[in-house]
Every structure is written in C-alpha cells, then in structure tokens.
Regions:
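Cytoplasmic C-terminal tails of single-pass
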Residues: 512-516
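Extracellular, repeat-based ectodomains that mediate carbohydrate processing or recognition
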Residues: 30-506
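Generic detector of short alpha-helix boundary/capping microenvironments
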Residues: 8-9, 20, 374, 483
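Bacterial N-terminal signal peptides
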Residues: 9-25
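N-terminal secretory signal peptides that target proteins for export/translocation
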Residues: 1-5
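Alpha-helical transmembrane segments of integral membrane proteins
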Residues: 7-11, 490-491
Length: 516
C-alpha cells in the first residue's frame, strides 16, 4: 500500500509541474532562432507600416491608423527578448471635411539612437524622438511642416545632415496632377530645412520614392514614374527611375530609366522598385515587370554611374496574375555579412494561386531560393518593410487586405503584421539604450506668495443628543476585525478539507470491508 501511495503522490506532484511548464512555454515570445521565421503577430489596424532598429536591438514600428475625426500615427516597440510595448498614437491629424487620409509614416534611426520620422495629412511633417523614450508621446518633438505632399523618406548622413525626399504635385499644361520628387536637407537637426529642389525633372508623376545613403555617403533615390501620384498611385503605363547626388545633396544627376522600353505602353511597365547596397559597396535594385510578372534586378559597381543589364531574380514571380495592385512596394536591407535581403509579395511558381510574403537573399553574386514569411488564401499581403538589428536579426512588417475588401479600404479589415528571424551572419554587440521614464507632474510653487500663518485649533465642548452607552455601540458591517482573515482562510480551505475527509473515510471503509 505504501508503494501505491507513493506513486499517487508522485503523480499529484508531476501533473502541476508538467502543466505549469506547458503554460510557461505558451507564454514565451515567438522565437526566430535557427533560421525559422516567427509566427506572424498582429500589431493592430490598419496599414502602411515601417520599421527601424536601434543599437540595443529594440525594433520600432509605426503604421497608419485612425479613429473618428482623426488620422493617426501608431507606434510600438519590441525588445530583443520579444516583449512589446503598448501601441500608442504619437500623432493624430484632424480629418478635413470628414475625409480620411493615410498618414503613411516612415522611420529612420541614426547612430545616436535618435528616431527620425515623417508622416502626412495633406502636408508632410517631420519629427524625432529618443529611441528610449519614443513610447511616450510627449517625448516626440512637435511636428514641423515640410510642405504639401504625399510620399516621404528621411535619412541622416555621417556628417549629421538630415536628408528628406517627398512627392508634391506640380501642375503643368500637359499634366494637372503630376507629383514630382523634391529634396530638402537640414543642418540643425531638423529645426529648419533648405528650399525644396525638384530632383525628378520629369514631365510625369512620381510615387513610392526610396532613399539610400551608401557607405561613401552618396545619396541614391529611386521611384516609380507615371501620370498622377495622388493617393499613392499612378496611372498606367509606369516605369522606374533613379537619381544620385555625390556632394551631399548639393547637386543631382539626371533621371535614369532602368528600362527605357518600359512606361510607354501597358504592355511593358515597371513598378515597386527598391534599392540596397551589398558588403562590397555595390548597389543593387529590384523591380517588378508587368504584365509578365517577373522580378528583375540590376547592379552597379561605380556608385550608380552605370548599371548592369536587367536580369530576372530566379525562382520568384510577382502577383499580377492574382492581384493587380498599384499600392504595393518592395523593400531591402543589408546584414552584417553584407548580404542584401529582398522582401516582397510574390509566388514561387507560375501555377501558384495564392500569394506569399517572400524573402530572397543576394550574396553579392547570386540569389538564394525564396523562403516564406507568411502565406495567404484570398487575403493579400502588401507594403512590406524590413530592417536588420544587431547585424543578424531580420525584422519585417507588412499589412494584409482581407479578401472581402481588397479594393474597399473603408470597409476593410486591414491589419499590420510583424515577423522576425535570425540569420547566420555575425552578431553585433548591443549598446544599451535605456528606456526613459515618463515625465512626472510638477507641483508649481509661487515663491512670491507669503506663506499663510498656521491657525491655532480651538477645542470646544459640543452637546450630544441621545448619547449611546459604550455597551450599546453597534459596529458597522464594513468594520473588519483581526479574525476576518482567519474566517476567510477557513472558508477557502473548507472544500478541500471536505474532499480530503471524504477520501480518508472511503479508504478506511474499503479497508474495513476487505478485512471483514
């Protein structure tokens, strides 16, 4: 009998331990070790996210959302351990005439762990915040209006100069709505900005510009070109264009079309261009060829002065056959080994009838096979953005359109998603970026006011009507005594004691009947 009791006791101890371990495993943050993408995590509603990583490995995410009467910029941060801050709206722009505008926020983190951000309503705004305090809305600098516009990007060069590009409509007789790409810079940490310079110089519109500052501090800008540019899209046909500045933004090269044959008819178009730099200092661009649904890439070994002939990225196709989007885009980032990671919505085979969010890696000479970050049936992933933290941790954000409302954003159930993965490049030692606590309210003291004299209390006898004798005093039911906790404890243990007593009684009865 003693052996049986021991086994029962061991089981009673083991079950809680196993159950507790299972719950602890469920509570752990999603892991991205050993080359596995973490399970996509929803950050909230609505669309067009961006991501940047500071020197501690903390990932910062912004996205466009809104509520009744306001269009907002949402912000959340993830620690290297996988803990997320509570999403907050760091900016809220009043809606005009009840019309909603996508705020389209962007992020850039500089070497001093300062976050630089742009967003829009009908104008472009710039702001910044310390990476350790961005989770507190009041730590964001009051926004500064740059000018009317739609798309924007900001970056900081090694000399501390801020560089900002944005699109703004330039009306001409031949094009009433043609958004050009403008460039401004700031030498005083964003307090003031230069006069805008039109760097597109095309008689057409522009959309989705991207800005890269290479290791030699040259500026590179790519964008999608066509008629229009308002509300984030162009009319067909479209092509992709590049310009560069080799003197810190003082002057710019003439626009260069990556494929001159594209953009003249709907039978040959290009969209969704992105640009990166590999570990050898060579530039690489990737763009989407329509309608053949091919992803092309081109490289430059002389800082963009000349480019290779376009070649297809192997083993990956676009999603034109599934969803003819004008608002999507591609994204690139480079890890500590110098490999360029391209993220896009695509397919791996022509027969594939569902979209996937894919990552393909350029090692300086060839592309890796695509790996799947997320796959969908009916829903459509869109607008991915990637950042690399600590040299080898990939952070990817995107949003998803629900199948029922692909082209109806007002009724859509669109959500922003996040996934991460660690790759086999060298890890960079993190630098501490401590969280800045929220400011404490201050007590304002008027030093000019003389202190008031402390009054001397007067004790007076007060007549009491119908006094109650001490023995007749009735205690309120809300007054507690020292014995209350004991009573509560006994009440809590009563069911367990009853069960234990019943078990012992049953055991004794069965033992007595066995010996009878």
């Amino acid at each position: 009998m003693s052996a049986r009791i021991f086994r029962v006791a061991l089981l009673l101890v083991a079950i809680p331990l196993l159950f507790g371990g299972w719950l602890a495993a469920l509570a752990l943050p999603a892991s991205a070790q050993n080359g596995v993408w973490s399970a996509p995590m929803s950050l909230g509603e609505y669309w067009f996210p961006d991501v940047a990583v500071d020197a501690s490995g903390r990932a910062h995410v912004v996205w466009s959302s809104g509520t009744t009467g306001f269009d907002s910029v949402m912000y959340a941060a993830r620690t290297p351990d996988g803990e997320w801050s509570r999403p907050i709206d760091v900016f809220a722009e009043p809606q005009i005439a009840s019309g909603s505008e996508a705020t389209r926020p962007t992020l850039f983190v500089d070497g001093e762990n300062q976050l630089h951000s742009t967003h829009r309503s009908t104008s472009i705004f710039y702001s910044q915040a310390p990476a350790g305090g961005a989770w507190v809305a009041s730590y964001w600098r009051p926004q500064l209006e740059i000018g009317e516009g739609y798309f924007s990007r900001v970056a900081r060069s090694a000399d501390g100069v801020l560089h900002l590009i944005y699109t703004q409509n330039l009306q001409t007789e031949t094009c009433r709505i043609c958004y050009h790409v403008y460039y401004v810079r700031s030498f005083d940490d964003g307090e003031s900005w230069s006069d805008p310079q039109d760097i597109s110089l095309e008689l057409t519109g522009s959309a989705k510009p991207q800005l890269l500052i290479d290791t030699d501090q040259n500026l590179h800008v790519v964008w999608e070109s066509g008629m229009g540019g308002s509300y984030g899209q162009l009319s067909d046909p479209t092509t992709v264009i590049y310009v560069a500045s080799y003197d810190g933004g003082e002057s710019w090269s003439l626009p260069y079309k990556f494929d001159p044959a594209r953009g003249t008819s709907t039978s040959a178009m290009a969209r969704n261009i992105t640009i990166g730099e590999d570990g050898n200092g060579n530039l690489i661009v990737a763009w989407w060829a329509i309608p053949e649904d091919t992803i092309y890439y081109q490289t430059s070994r002389d800082a963009g002065r000349t480019w290779s002939i376009a070649q297809p990225v192997p083993n990956v196709l676009g999603i034109w056959a599934l969803y003819q989007s004008r608002l999507d885009d591609y994204t690139m980032a480079t890890d500590s080994a110098g490999r360029v990671h391209l993220v896009l919505a695509g397919r791996r085979t022509a027969e594939q009838t569902w979209p996937e969010l894919l990552r393909i890696t350029w090692d300086g000479s060839s592309w890796s096979p695509p790996d799947v970050i997320a796959a969908y049936q009916g829903d459509m992933p869109e607008w991915p953005r990637i950042a690399v933290g600590l040299g080898n941790v990939l952070h990817v954000v995107w949003f998803v359109r629900d199948a029922e409302n692909l082209f109806n954003s007002a009724a859509g159930n669109y959500r922003v998603w996040y996934s991460t993965r660690t790759v086999n490049s060298e890890s960079i030692v993190p630098v501490e970026v401590p969280l800045i606590p929220p400011p404490q309210p201050r007590t304002v003291v008027n030093e000019q006011s003389a202190p008031l004299p402390t009054p001397t209390p007067r004790i007076e006898t007060v007549p009491v009507e119908d006094p109650v004798a001490p023995g007749e005093l009735v205690l309120s039911q809300n007054i507690r005594s020292e014995n209350d906790e004991v009573i509560v404890l006994l009440m809590a243990l009563a069911p367990a004691l009853v069960i234990l007593l019943a078990t012992v009684t049953l055991f004794l009865l069965r033992r007595r009947s066995r010996h009878a």
